[in-house]
């Protein structure tokens, strides 16, 4: 049985395009794990089909900056002229529901969270870095999405190269050959770290 009193938090880390979102969809279907995705707050405009409070918490830049000043974020970052951040209140809400929060963050955000909370015994961190099968495959996945210009793809790839250098900062590393295989490996890691 999963020990919910440990206040486990899963940090799922990896470069953009590595498949974290697809892996999460599989993990959230698990009857064994009681996972909930921590929704981030953002100042970016809502995309078609997105719902406030479901996909993100869409807030104004002023409100976001006020939350920064009040130390309401576990971490926050500016990405392509928009703020993104993980609200501590969202994590506490997930705990109150008897579930394990999953934070899908880039390396920079993960490092900020771990720096801020590493000496606090409040949380049991399960840090997992998702690797692409190869750098070329990562680029192919980003291109196939069809959502970015060549310039944005180049920026994402340069950022991914930097993020891959930090992979050893995380306790577990898995390679996403297929989302099913990666999700199975991650489920085993989470079960091992949360039992007892």
Swiss-Prot record:
InterPro entries linked to this entry: GK/Ca_channel_bsu, Guanylate_kin-like_dom, Guanylate_kinase, Guanylate_kinase_CS, P-loop_NTPase
Annotated localization: Cytoplasm
SUPFAM superfamilies, per database record: P-loop containing nucleoside triphosphate hydrolases (SSF52540)
Top-level taxon in the UniProt lineage: Bacteria
Key words, A-Z: ATP-binding, Cytoplasm, Kinase, Nucleotide-binding, Transferase
Annotated protein name in UniProt: Guanylate kinase
UniProt GO molecular function: ATP binding; guanylate kinase activity
Guanylate kinase-like domain location: 7-191
Cellular component terms per the entry's GO annotation: cytosol
Residues that, per the record, bind ATP: 14-21
EC number: 2.7.4.8
PANTHER family membership: GUANYLATE KINASE, GUANYLATE KINASE-RELATED
Catalyzed reactions: GMP + ATP = GDP + ADP
Family the entry assigns: Belongs to the guanylate kinase family.
Described purpose of this protein according to its UniProt entry: Essential for recycling GMP and indirectly, cGMP.
């Amino acid at each position: 049985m999963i020990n919910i009193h440990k206040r486990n938090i899963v940090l799922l880390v990896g470069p953009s395009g590595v498949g974290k979102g697809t892996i999460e969809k599989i993990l959230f279907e698990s009857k064994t794990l009681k996972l909930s995705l921590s929704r981030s707050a953002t100042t970016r405009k809502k995309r078609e089909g997105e719902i406030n409070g479901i996909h993100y918490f869409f807030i104004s830049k002023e409100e976001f900056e006020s939350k920064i000043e009040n130390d309401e974020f576990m971490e926050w970052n500016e990405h392509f002229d928009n703020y993104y951040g993980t609200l501590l209140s969202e994590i506490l809400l997930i705990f109150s529901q008897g579930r394990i929060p999953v934070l899908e963050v880039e390396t920079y955000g993960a490092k900020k969270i771990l720096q801020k909370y590493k000496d606090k015994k409040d949380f049991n961190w399960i840090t997992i870095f998702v690797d692409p099968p190869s750098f070329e495959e990562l680029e192919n996945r980003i291109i196939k999405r069809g959502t970015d210009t060549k310039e944005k793809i180049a920026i994402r790839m340069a950022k991914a190269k930097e993020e891959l250098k930090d992979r050893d900062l995380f306790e577990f590393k898995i390679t996403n050959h297929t989302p099913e295989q990666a999700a199975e490996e991650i489920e085993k890691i989470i079960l091992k770290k949360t039992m007892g």
